[in-house]
Amino acid sequence: MIYQKQRNTAETQLNISISDDQSPSHINTGVGFLNHMLTLFTFHSGLSLNIEAQGDIDVDDHHVTEDIGIVIGQLLLEMIKDKKHFVRYGTMYIPMDETLARVVVDISGRPYLSFNATLSKEKVGTFDTELVEEFFRAVVINARLTTHIDLIRGGNTHHEIEAIFKAFSRALGIALTATDDQRVPSSKGVIE
């Protein structure tokens, strides 16, 4: 199933769709480094993502990065509500040469982000690295996930961020994996 949403504000105009059919993705955020990271997200999560975004990137990349995270989170929440029967938990360690990242995801209905990653530099190209945390906070809060992101070993800043995105994507993909178990994956009987 394809989940689609538009978001139009004074700062950004977004048209985003997500599906779990692994169809080809098209990503145009206007921010080259973010395009690269979201391409990795689609490959490693097994999700298809189509993004057409325009924003005030002449100011900086903050609004478009955060707003894309908000919409991806909202679409993931819709997908989760429709799935009902899924693994729920996902954990992944990803090395990227000298760096090592760990991400743990719980599709809990309780939004929480622990972001324990001191990135080596403030920029990768023109991209402000503090936006990595802003992006994940937007996704996690809007998808209602509990997520722990830890950069265990650092080095090259591009590698650090890439390892984090890959680990999150793989952990999310595991957590979203469908199961034959007809019970809601919570002893409460509900995930809200």
UniProtKB/Swiss-Prot annotation:
UniProt-listed InterPro entries: IGPD_sf, ImidazoleglycerolP_deHydtase, ImidazoleglycerP_deHydtase_CS, Ribosomal_Su5_D2-typ_SF
PANTHER family per the UniProt record, alphabetical: IMIDAZOLEGLYCEROL-PHOSPHATE DEHYDRATASE, IMIDAZOLEGLYCEROL-PHOSPHATE DEHYDRATASE HIS7
Molecular-function GO term, any one: imidazoleglycerol-phosphate dehydratase activity
Record bears the keyword Endoplasmic reticulum: no
Protein family (similarity comment): Belongs to the imidazoleglycerol-phosphate dehydratase family.
Pfam family membership, one: IGPD
Keywords assigned by UniProt, alphabetized: Amino-acid biosynthesis, Cytoplasm, Histidine biosynthesis, Lyase
Recorded metabolic or biological pathway in which this protein acts: Amino-acid biosynthesis; L-histidine biosynthesis; L-histidine from 5-phospho-alpha-D-ribose 1-diphosphate: step 6/9
Species this protein is from: Staphylococcus aureus (strain bovine RF122 / ET3-1)
Compartmental location: Cytoplasm
Location (main, coarse): cytoplasm
Keyword Lyase carried by entry: yes
One GO biological process term: L-histidine biosynthetic process
Listed GO CC annotations: cytoplasm
Record-listed E.C. numbers: 4.2.1.19
Chemical reaction(s) catalysed: D-erythro-1-(imidazol-4-yl)glycerol 3-phosphate = 3-(imidazol-4-yl)-2-oxopropyl phosphate + H2O
CDD domains for this protein: IGPD (cd07914)
Name of the molecule in the record: Imidazoleglycerol-phosphate dehydratase
